[in-house]
């Protein structure tokens, strides 16, 4: 059984902790003392229009190069593109469910709600994810061969 603890501090390190972090979560004061980390944290705040820097980024601050690389890639992938922002968040949630990442499920569900996800849409989305998991398991368990009409061939 996992223990749950309520954490809170002045730098936004708050929330219900399901597990103890295996890495240090940087405070705002620590981030300000490192130019690379401070720059990424400032960009996170500016990009999101929020004073909050999530615990994920605070953990990545232990490796400034990884923090910079990951933030840059996430901004690119989740930024403007062909897919609308809500669809991108829903894909992120589905993958997070498949990977069993509660942190990612919660953070991207919050982001999806901020982008307009309704309770009805959320329920329907979760039903689709659940059905996909069920039918994927059945197909894999039964080793059903792929129909010729479904095969994706390389284009010219």
Region roles according to the model:
Residues 1-156:
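Hydrophobic alpha-helical segments
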């Amino acid at each position: 059984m996992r223990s749950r603890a309520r954490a809170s501090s002045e730098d936004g390190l708050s929330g219900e902790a399901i597990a103890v972090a295996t890495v240090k979560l940087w405070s705002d004061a620590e981030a300000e003392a490192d130019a690379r980390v401070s720059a990424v944290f400032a960009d996170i705040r500016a990009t999101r229009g929020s004073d909050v820097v999530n615990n994920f980024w605070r953990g990545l601050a232990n490796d400034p190069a990884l923090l910079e690389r990951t933030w840059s890639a996430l901004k690119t992938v989740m930024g403007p593109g062909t897919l609308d922002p809500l669809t991108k968040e829903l894909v992120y949630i589905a993958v997070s469910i498949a990977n069993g990442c509660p942190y990612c499920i919660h953070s991207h569900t919050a982001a999806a709600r901020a982008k307009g996800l309704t309770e009805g849409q959320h329920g329907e989305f979760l039903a689709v994810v659940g059905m996909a998991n069920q039918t994927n398991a059945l197909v894999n368990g039964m080793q059903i061969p792929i129909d010729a009409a479904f095969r994706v061939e390389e284009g010219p």
